[in-house]
Swiss-Prot record:
This is Proline--tRNA ligase. GO terms for molecular function: ATP binding; proline-tRNA ligase activity. It catalyses: tRNA(Pro) + L-proline + ATP = L-prolyl-tRNA(Pro) + AMP + diphosphate. Keywords: Aminoacyl-tRNA synthetase, ATP-binding, Cytoplasm, Ligase, Nucleotide-binding, Protein biosynthesis. Homodimer. GO terms for cellular component: aminoacyl-tRNA synthetase multienzyme complex; cytoplasm. HAMAP family: Pro_tRNA_synth_type3. The keyword NAD does not apply. Catalyzes the attachment of proline to tRNA(Pro) in a two-step reaction: proline is first activated by ATP to form Pro-AMP and then transferred to the acceptor end of tRNA(Pro). One of its GO terms (biological process) is prolyl-tRNA aminoacylation. Its EC number is 6.1.1.15. Consists of three domains: the N-terminal catalytic domain, the anticodon-binding domain and the C-terminal extension.
Length: 491
């Protein structure tokens, strides 16, 4: 198969789909809308998991696991919550198959109908809050800070690998608190954890903000979010954190005895990120040659490709590299020494470029004589010849520079593609001619928000917390507006 990718400028969607497949990240599964995450793609997700899990534990959270199947009656206890997910729920109605009487296959056994249908987990608030009813009795049981790593199912109609799939992997945090203020602090803290992860590890600049009522999570009183801009000018929601108030506590009768002895409902939060982050990572940084991975999340940070003609030359290269490989390992730098003779060095160069390996080292017989190696950066494609002496230190410094440069490039793109619109005509022109984030005034009503969405396909991504904005007048109605909000067309 040709490794030449479609160009982003020609067909961004095709470029993305082809890159995911050709870089061996994922492929479509037999069940429509599901995906198979391949080893290379899963290794990136594992690195994300490891970093996030450490951050969660540093903020006092513990991991647990709750069932995949949820009794249908649980979902009906929180009306606004089920309204938000009803159309996406997969339902289990029977528990057994049997052979067809004609001997031509298997069928669902009609006698094995469940007394109560089970919902395949679209999210776990209901089953977790039903459990919290037995776990929480006293103020001494609070705060309860739980996270789970799991798969969920939402029956999506329009799917795309990593970005929107019927089944996806994620983490979901669910916490319970004695006071409203503690729960709000937790909600904001987890939004900030996600933003720190996105910026420091994914090299992805994000806006922190609050969702409008129309875009709020079903069952939440407030939804905080982080929003990123992809290279085609579309926004992507990279993480959400929800202040649930006492909605789920009241629905599932979760009370605690306060220090004063009175019975009170707890306050809740939930928050999550998913394999959608993989899509964000790919679309934010990659180019027409393939993936561009930030070193902190790259499964292979450095690949060493020896250039040799004889076994003796390879032996000499391996002997030269032995202390260098040991030094890199001591620095916890992930390195692959690809000395296989199945493919030419040129093929390997192209393959590792496609897979986004941040730094490539080439070493041949002449380099051995000169005491040098050639380094090639994936982010800038710059090649340099450097001494073998102190190479591990050189590589360590260069990986830090690459991480920072990838972020700076993404930040510069976002800033160059963030616009201000003062009237609706300009707003619509910007959406069509210069896609990106648009800061504009909105009167705060769901009706105006829905009108904009219907007419332009743009949504309020968030009411930004990190953008200074003055009061003004709504670009559509002319009514007063407290501040500019962030609009974009989005994934």
């Amino acid at each position: 198969m040709s490794k030449v990718l479609p160009k982003r400028s020609d067909d961004y969607s095709l470029w993305y789909n082809e890159l995911v497949k050709r870089a061996d990240l994922a492929e479509n599964a037999p069940v429509r809308g599901c995906m198979i995450i391949k080893p290379y793609g899963y290794s990136i997700w594992e690195k994300m998991q490891a970093v996030l899990d450490k951050m969660f534990k540093e903020t006092g959270h513990s991991n647990a696991y709750f069932p995949l199947f949820i009794p249908k009656s649980y979902l009906s206890k929180e009306a606004s919550h089920i309204d938000g997910f009803a159309k996406e729920c997969a339902v289990v109605t029977h528990y057994r198959l049997k052979n067809d009487e004609n001997g031509k296959g298997i069928i669902v056994d009609p006698e094995a109908k469940l007394d109560e249908e089970l919902i395949v987990r679209p999210t776990s608030e209901t089953v977790i809050w039903n459990t919290y009813k037995t776990w929480i009795q006293s103020h001494r049981d609070l705060p309860l800070l739980i996270n789970q790593w799991a798969n969920v199912v939402r029956w999506e109609m329009r799917t795309r690998l990593f970005l929107r799939t019927t089944e996806f992997l994620w983490q979901e945090g669910h916490t319970a608190h004695a006071t409203k203020q503690e729960a709000i602090v937790e909600t904001e803290q987890m939004m900030n954890v996600y933003a720190t992860f996105a910026q420091n590890f994914m090299a992805l600049p994000v806006h922190r903000g609050i969702k409008s009522a129309n875009e709020r999570f079903a069952g939440a009183e407030e939804t905080y979010c982080i929003e990123a801009l992809m290279q085609d000018g579309k926004a992507l929601q990279a993480g959400t954190s929800h202040f649930l108030g006492q909605n789920f506590a009241k629905a599932f009768d979760v009370k605690f005895a306060s220090k004063e002895g009175s019975l009170e409902y707890v306050w809740g939060t939930s928050w999550g990120v998913s394999t959608r982050l993989m899509g964000a990572l790919i679309m934010a940084h990659s180019d027409d040659e393939g993936l561009v991975l930030p070193p902190l999340l790259a499964p292979i940070q450095v690949v060493i490709v020896p250039i040799f003609k004889t076994a003796e030359q390879l032996d000499l290269i391996e002997a030269t590299l032995k202390p260098i490989l040991a030094a890199l390992k001591a620095k916890d730098i992930s390195v692959k020494f690809d000395h296989s003779d199945k493919y030419s060095p040129g093929f390997k160069f192209a393959e590792y470029e496609l897979k986004g390996v941040p730094l490539r080292v080439a070493i041949g017989a002449r380099d051995i004589e000169n005491g040098t190696v050639e380094l090639a950066r994936r982010d800038t494609k710059e090649k340099t010849t450097v001494p073998q002496e102190g190479l591990a230190d050189t590589i360590e410094k260069l990986l830090q520079e690459i991480q920072e440069n990838i972020y700076k490039k993404a930040f510069a793109y976002r800033e160059a593609n963030t616009f201000v619109a003062d009237d609706y005509t300009t707003f619509k022109t910007m959406l069509d001619e210069t896609p990106g984030f648009i800061l504009a005034h909105w009167d705060g009503t769901p009706e105006t928000e829905e009108k904009i969405k219907e007419e332009t396909k743009a949504t309020i991504r968030c009411i930004p917390l990190d953008v200074t904005s003055e009061p003004g007048i709504c670009m559509v109605t002319g009514k007063p507006s407290a501040q500019r909000v962030l609009f974009a067309r989005a994934y």
